[in-house]
């Protein structure tokens, strides 16, 4: 595949409509017209509200005769109180849709607002483990368009969102099968201005998604194929995107790789995310960075005995040695190459939190799909390793 191939505009439907290619943001007015949208609410995170892509989106919508409000109060780790404020904004502005633009936090925030925008249910009634909420036709979720501006979370196609429960200090997955984006718009131009550290952190998140999803037990050839192709794209293009941030092919490859890995984790995730969710909820750490630090610890715990899985992942990354040790060494080399810190302590997570983080991680839905079950004591040892020396 050539660089030109990667930059060729494409329209896919898998599992939702996806419009991919440089400059596709300019088509957002046409998409709104096709969906019958007149007054969407733009949802983004606090760090993105003053960035050029927000004003550009507003301008393109205005030129197309579409009025739009803006809600930009989503934190890097979205909180339940912010979602409530966003719901009030949606209702008071008589909005008919949500356009979630930004990183994973913005898209998760937009999805969470959608869940309660037209009903009086508590947000936590949509928690993954809860009985599925019955949503009637008169309470149908608003139309949702997702526009990622980072290449990492893969949140743009998902029906799930991660939100911090402020009362419990824990992250939970909220979900409803009827919540599906009507369009994911993937424009690599929107990621060109992403700083090197965020390119690295969000890109490493995509790698974690691909690896964890592929390692989840069970027969799911669709997700497995997407995970391996996503891993191949990320392994090839992430170092390039960090070193040469204006390389459009690298940005495009990363955006597609991230999307594929995000679709793949319909299959599930694992202990990297179980721990990372709780660290992020308590210490507000950047999600992709936290995942990247923890990853080698969990690989050393999970991979022995999984040589059949490791071989295919090694092939995807272009390795000639498909042993478990060689695969872990390559992952660690890539993390070193993009300057990922070697421990959670280096990003300000205190050493005395291991016990309570482990206790919370055991309750995370991602722990239930990890390929190797961890006891409570083992989980605490994993957290301690990530705190002290992950690689």
Where are each of the predicted segments found?
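Gly/Pro-rich interdomain helix-loop hinge
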Residues: 282-353
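N-terminal small/polar loop signature for handling phosphorylated ligands or for N-terminal nucleophile
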Residues: 49-122, 239-251
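Carboxylate- and glycine-rich phosphate/diphosphate-binding segment that chelates Mg2+/Mn2+
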Residues: 158-267
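Short, amphipathic C-terminal "tail helix"
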Residues: 351-391
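Glycine-rich phosphate/pyrophosphate-binding beta-alpha loops
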Residues: 152, 259-291, 364-369
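An N-terminal, well-structured beta->alpha segment
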Residues: 1-70, 389-391
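Glycine/threonine-rich beta-strand-loop-alpha-helix active-site module
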Residues: 81-188
